[in-house]
Protein backbone atom coordinates (compact mmCIF):
# COMPACT_ATOMS: atom_id res chain seq x y z
CA UNK A 1 0.00 0.00 0.00
CA UNK A 2 1.21 3.50 -0.74
CA UNK A 3 2.26 5.22 2.45
CA UNK A 4 1.24 8.55 0.96
CA UNK A 5 -2.21 10.01 0.71
CA UNK A 6 -3.50 12.80 -1.52
CA UNK A 7 -6.78 14.20 -0.25
CA UNK A 8 -8.96 16.65 -2.14
CA UNK A 9 -11.59 18.79 -0.45
CA UNK A 10 -14.24 18.61 -3.17
CA UNK A 11 -16.08 21.63 -1.78
CA UNK A 12 -13.10 23.89 -2.55
CA UNK A 13 -12.06 22.79 -6.06
CA UNK A 14 -13.06 25.23 -8.81
CA UNK A 15 -11.49 23.27 -11.71
CA UNK A 16 -8.87 25.93 -12.39
CA UNK A 17 -6.54 23.17 -13.65
CA UNK A 18 -3.46 24.73 -12.04
CA UNK A 19 -2.61 21.30 -10.59
CA UNK A 20 -2.82 19.60 -13.99
CA UNK A 21 -0.84 22.35 -15.72
CA UNK A 22 1.88 22.37 -13.06
CA UNK A 23 2.21 18.59 -13.33
CA UNK A 24 2.67 18.81 -17.10
CA UNK A 25 5.06 21.73 -16.73
CA UNK A 26 7.31 20.14 -14.12
CA UNK A 27 7.48 16.94 -16.20
CA UNK A 28 8.05 19.00 -19.39
CA UNK A 29 5.24 17.24 -21.23
CA UNK A 30 3.81 18.19 -24.62
CA UNK A 31 0.13 18.52 -25.47
CA UNK A 32 -1.57 15.16 -24.95
CA UNK A 33 -0.31 13.21 -21.95
CA UNK A 34 -1.87 14.14 -18.61
CA UNK A 35 -0.44 12.32 -15.58
CA UNK A 36 -3.26 13.88 -13.58
CA UNK A 37 -6.74 14.88 -14.62
CA UNK A 38 -9.79 16.69 -13.31
CA UNK A 39 -13.05 14.82 -13.83
CA UNK A 40 -16.29 16.79 -13.73
CA UNK A 41 -19.17 15.15 -11.88
CA UNK A 42 -22.49 16.67 -12.81
CA UNK A 43 -23.88 19.17 -13.09
CA UNK A 44 -26.94 18.19 -11.13
CA UNK A 45 -29.60 20.28 -9.47
CA UNK A 46 -29.15 20.85 -5.75
CA UNK A 47 -31.55 23.26 -4.05
CA UNK A 48 -32.76 24.30 -7.50
CA UNK A 49 -29.25 25.34 -8.55
CA UNK A 50 -26.92 23.50 -10.89
CA UNK A 51 -23.89 22.14 -9.06
CA UNK A 52 -20.87 20.22 -10.22
CA UNK A 53 -17.99 18.60 -8.41
CA UNK A 54 -14.46 18.42 -9.74
CA UNK A 55 -12.44 15.36 -8.81
CA UNK A 56 -8.66 15.44 -9.10
CA UNK A 57 -7.47 12.10 -10.49
CA UNK A 58 -3.77 11.33 -10.23
CA UNK A 59 -2.43 7.77 -10.17
CA UNK A 60 -3.80 5.76 -7.25
CA UNK A 61 -0.47 3.98 -6.59
CA UNK A 62 -2.28 0.67 -6.20
CA UNK A 63 -1.31 -2.02 -3.70
CA UNK A 64 -0.89 -4.55 -6.52
CA UNK A 65 -0.52 -2.36 -9.63
CA UNK A 66 -1.41 -4.14 -12.84
CA UNK A 67 0.82 -1.74 -14.76
CA UNK A 68 3.86 -3.02 -12.87
CA UNK A 69 2.85 -6.66 -13.29
CA UNK A 70 2.57 -6.47 -17.10
CA UNK A 71 5.68 -4.39 -17.81
CA UNK A 72 8.09 -6.70 -19.69
CA UNK A 73 11.19 -4.58 -19.03
CA UNK A 74 10.72 -3.61 -15.38
CA UNK A 75 10.33 0.04 -16.37
CA UNK A 76 7.12 0.35 -14.37
CA UNK A 77 8.15 -0.06 -10.76
CA UNK A 78 6.85 0.31 -7.23
CA UNK A 79 9.17 1.74 -4.61
CA UNK A 80 9.24 -0.69 -1.68
CA UNK A 81 9.95 2.02 0.89
CA UNK A 82 6.80 4.06 0.23
CA UNK A 83 4.66 2.34 -2.43
CA UNK A 84 5.05 5.01 -5.10
CA UNK A 85 4.52 3.58 -8.59
CA UNK A 86 6.75 5.19 -11.21
CA UNK A 87 8.26 4.75 -14.67
CA UNK A 88 12.00 4.28 -15.16
CA UNK A 89 12.24 6.04 -18.53
CA UNK A 90 15.59 4.42 -19.31
CA UNK A 91 13.94 0.98 -19.24
CA UNK A 92 10.69 1.90 -21.00
CA UNK A 93 10.51 0.58 -24.58
CA UNK A 94 7.12 2.13 -25.32
CA UNK A 95 5.16 -1.12 -25.61
CA UNK A 96 2.16 0.49 -23.83
CA UNK A 97 1.14 -2.71 -22.03
CA UNK A 98 0.91 -0.72 -18.80
CA UNK A 99 -1.54 1.67 -20.43
CA UNK A 100 -3.79 -1.22 -21.41
CA UNK A 101 -3.52 -2.81 -17.96
CA UNK A 102 -4.42 0.23 -15.85
CA UNK A 103 -8.20 0.55 -15.38
CA UNK A 104 -7.78 4.20 -14.37
CA UNK A 105 -5.79 5.42 -17.37
CA UNK A 106 -2.92 6.63 -15.21
CA UNK A 107 -0.05 5.70 -17.56
CA UNK A 108 -0.05 8.17 -20.44
CA UNK A 109 1.72 8.08 -23.81
CA UNK A 110 4.30 10.77 -24.52
CA UNK A 111 4.54 11.00 -28.32
CA UNK A 112 7.71 13.10 -28.16
CA UNK A 113 9.73 10.47 -26.29
CA UNK A 114 7.86 7.34 -27.38
CA UNK A 115 7.61 6.37 -23.71
CA UNK A 116 5.01 6.23 -20.99
CA UNK A 117 4.70 8.86 -18.24
CA UNK A 118 2.53 8.89 -15.13
CA UNK A 119 1.98 10.57 -11.80
CA UNK A 120 4.72 9.58 -9.40
CA UNK A 121 3.69 12.00 -6.64
CA UNK A 122 6.75 14.03 -7.75
CA UNK A 123 8.97 11.46 -6.03
CA UNK A 124 12.11 13.51 -6.68
CA UNK A 125 10.52 16.44 -4.83
CA UNK A 126 9.37 14.13 -2.01
CA UNK A 127 12.91 12.83 -1.64
CA UNK A 128 13.98 16.45 -1.05
CA UNK A 129 11.31 16.96 1.60
CA UNK A 130 8.99 18.91 -0.73
CA UNK A 131 5.35 18.29 -1.59
CA UNK A 132 4.10 17.28 -5.04
CA UNK A 133 3.90 20.16 -7.50
CA UNK A 134 0.12 19.86 -7.86
CA UNK A 135 -0.37 20.45 -4.13
CA UNK A 136 1.92 23.48 -3.99
CA UNK A 137 0.09 25.39 -6.74
CA UNK A 138 -3.51 24.63 -5.79
CA UNK A 139 -5.17 28.05 -5.82
CA UNK A 140 -7.92 27.09 -3.38
CA UNK A 141 -5.74 24.86 -1.18
CA UNK A 142 -8.11 21.95 -1.75
CA UNK A 143 -5.29 19.39 -2.13
CA UNK A 144 -3.57 17.93 0.92
CA UNK A 145 -0.68 15.49 0.80
CA UNK A 146 1.12 13.49 3.43
CA UNK A 147 1.77 10.11 4.92
CA UNK A 148 -1.38 8.29 5.90
CA UNK A 149 -0.33 8.05 9.55
CA UNK A 150 0.38 11.81 9.64
CA UNK A 151 -2.87 12.95 8.02
CA UNK A 152 -4.97 14.86 10.55
CA UNK A 153 -8.07 13.05 11.78
CA UNK A 154 -10.37 15.88 10.67
CA UNK A 155 -9.16 15.52 7.07
CA UNK A 156 -9.73 11.76 7.14
CA UNK A 157 -13.24 12.28 8.53
CA UNK A 158 -14.01 15.00 5.99
CA UNK A 159 -12.85 12.71 3.19
CA UNK A 160 -15.07 9.91 4.45
CA UNK A 161 -18.05 12.28 4.63
CA UNK A 162 -17.44 13.90 1.25
CA UNK A 163 -17.10 10.61 -0.60
CA UNK A 164 -20.14 9.19 1.16
CA UNK A 165 -22.15 12.27 0.24
CA UNK A 166 -21.22 11.92 -3.43
CA UNK A 167 -22.38 8.32 -3.72
CA UNK A 168 -25.92 8.29 -5.00
CA UNK A 169 -28.16 5.47 -6.06
CA UNK A 170 -28.60 5.31 -9.82
CA UNK A 171 -32.09 4.24 -10.91
Question: Which positions does each model-derived feature cover?
Answer:
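Non-ligating segments of multi-cofactor redox enzymes
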Residues: 1-171
